Amino acid sequence: MKIFKPALWKIPPIENGSETALAEKTETLKQRLHRIAGSHRDARFASSLAAEDMVITDLIAGENLNIGIFTLDTGLLHAETLNLLDRIERVYPHMQIKRFQPIREDALHYVESKGRFAFYDSVEARRECCRIRKTEPLDRAIAGADAWLTGQRREQSATRTELPFAEYDAGRGIDKYNPIFDWSEHDVWAYILANNVPYNDLYRQGFPSIGCDPCTRPVKAGEDIRAGRWWWEDKNSKECGLHK
């Protein structure tokens, strides 16, 4: 008997005639990054290693901007994500990406008191896991900085449709920027494919949005690009708490 396999999301191809529009968007993004670097003594980019984050990373490296880059190694990342980190270090040897990990005792206590996969039990349990593995390490990563950057885009989810370029992170008392906020998925991939920017191998396996291994799965063609993130929850709760 033939087993039916649903068609999965695929990396969008470069659209014909998009070169001029992409060049304009790229120039605007460069200007935004230069503005951020020039107006802050210590700006730091929180890279999730997603495709849009790799666009920003490539421009920071290419423009030699004074913007530090870090990523959150949650302890639950896919092997493909860790492999990407190694590739980034080879492609951009002059650039250091700092890794911030959860406090080991807190992560162990969560597992021992609640269970290894307790994040499937409730939104509260999942958010507590995200707090330990993402939010607390992020707070350490931007401590002392006067601005931080994200790779968030308006198109990504229902909770990001009004995302601005610049905002104030009142909870942390720091300026926050979303420099690629107005790029589309096609813009992101057109840049990556045209400039041979390294990206996570999971994208070729139907993952348009990538988080921790237990909380991410492939997405079917036509589904929301974040449908594979915390798929057991309501779409309006699908945030990890980093962007309060």
Swiss-Prot record:
Catalytic activity line of the entry: [thioredoxin]-disulfide + sulfite + AMP + 2 H(+) = adenosine 5'-phosphosulfate + [thioredoxin]-dithiol
InterPro entries: APS_reductase (IPR011798), PAPS/APS_Rdtase (IPR004511), PAPS_reduct_dom (IPR002500), Rossmann-like_a/b/a_fold (IPR014729)
GO-annotated cellular components: cytoplasm
GO biological process, one term: cysteine biosynthetic process
Cofactor info, note text: Binds 1 [4Fe-4S] cluster per subunit.
Pathway: Sulfur metabolism; hydrogen sulfide biosynthesis; sulfite from sulfate
GO MF entries: 4 iron, 4 sulfur cluster binding; adenylyl-sulfate reductase (thioredoxin) activity; metal ion binding; phosphoadenylyl-sulfate reductase (thioredoxin) activity
Active site: C240
Membrane spanning stretches: none
Compartments (UniProt record): Cytoplasm
EC annotation from Swiss-Prot or TrEMBL: 1.8.4.10
Positions bound to [4Fe-4S] cluster: C129, C130, C212, C215
Pfam families associated with the record: PAPS_reduct
Cofactor(s) listed: [4Fe-4S] cluster
Main location: cytoplasm
The protein's enzyme class: oxidoreductase
Keywords: Cytoplasm, Iron, Iron-sulfur, Metal-binding, Oxidoreductase
UniProt family annotation: Belongs to the PAPS reductase family. CysH subfamily.
Record function comment: Catalyzes the formation of sulfite from adenosine 5'-phosphosulfate (APS) using thioredoxin as an electron donor.
Full protein name: Adenosine 5'-phosphosulfate reductase
Organism for this UniProt entry: Neisseria meningitidis serogroup A / serotype 4A (strain DSM 15465 / Z2491)
